[in-house]
Amino acid sequence: MTLDDLIIKTVSPVVKPVVPNLYTGESVRYCTFNYSELAEGIGDNAAHLTRALVQVHYFAPLKASTLAVRHALRDAIAAVDNFTLPSIENATDETGQHYVLEFDAVGRWEAEDDGQS
């Protein structure tokens, strides 16, 4: 399973749709995610693990009640063995609510083919 697959599997029971990077659909409530990868557990000139600095972005209409969903997202992420408890940053602006859940993921995942040579 790739890290993308694991994030989607974790977030989608709470919010759908959930996609990497950019959502271009019609839903007014959705999640996107992105992450940076760092070598972890380095020894014998090799990285034995990867630490991903993950951001899950939850978007909703300005007047929507989102507290229960934000807490459900936090709890779902925290329940994954190799994910840390996320912080939640409010990035809301005049176009809608936007919450960023930031956490670390440490492990070994299958490689994701990004389609670039």
Tell me the role of every PLM-derived stretch.
Residues 1-53, 59-117:
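Long, contiguous binding/interaction regions
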